[in-house]
């Protein structure tokens, strides 16, 4: 048997399914472990699209593993080191998720998205145009679209249910949710991870404009980096060679899909329309190109 080229939804009868997210299927794998399967599902405008992107889940898994390993000295992460066969002894089930599964520690997720912005783009640009600030953090006047910020900003948000939008919150609200010590640690770690990763990526021709981290804690209250790590899904990657402030750069992600969907008369509610083969292929290649540049593989 060979692993399937695309996987829209996993089916592992030997493990209890805990949750299906927009992209990931999460299974319980004993008292202290979970299995995260990254599928090829793609969401746009908070709606899951009906067509998988070939190989996307494997790219996201390899990129996450790369960053978890590279930045492990900054903060513990959720990787358990347990081999896949230890939780999936059935070869057929293992084959189904090979290359797209991670056996991780069971941790308590924190109810905050740790967003770090290094460039003025997206909702941050709209906020700045309106108020001269991003998420309440004042910035110098005269900054242009996509301009590098004087320093990276920690702009946390709530974790919304699937189908809803995250909402930006102030640091005091983070303190109210998880306590001051943990909030300050999260901010320090998120900014440190971003700065180191952004410098590394820039040397390889990629600008990390912004990214989203998720964290959890173990029973001792120790902060861990969980979920995914600096992937094209959780981050805005731009090619450095074409970067010019004042112009919105192309992204190494699902921009082809978003641009195509904007040409349709679709109300951005389920069910989503099917995607043409060329859009699927071009999107898959963008994900692979980001991986090649970052990891050299």
From Swiss-Prot:
The gene is purC. InterPro entries: SAICAR_synt/ADE2_N, SAICAR_synth, SAICAR_synthetase_CS. Pathway: Purine metabolism; IMP biosynthesis via de novo pathway; 5-amino-1-(5-phospho-D-ribosyl)imidazole-4-carboxamide from 5-amino-1-(5-phospho-D-ribosyl)imidazole-4-carboxylate: step 1/2. Its EC number is 6.3.2.6. This is Phosphoribosylaminoimidazole-succinocarboxamide synthase. It comes from the Bacteria. Belongs to the SAICAR synthetase family. Pfam families: SAICAR_synt. GO terms for biological process: 'de novo' IMP biosynthetic process. GO terms for cellular component: cytoplasm. It catalyses: 5-amino-1-(5-phospho-D-ribosyl)imidazole-4-carboxylate + L-aspartate + ATP = (2S)-2-[5-amino-1-(5-phospho-beta-D-ribosyl)imidazole-4-carboxamido]succinate + ADP + phosphate + 2 H(+). CDD domains: SAICAR_synt_Sc. One of its GO terms (molecular function) is phosphoribosylaminoimidazolesuccinocarboxamide synthase activity. It is an enzyme of class 6 (ligase). Keywords: ATP-binding, Ligase, Nucleotide-binding, Purine biosynthesis.
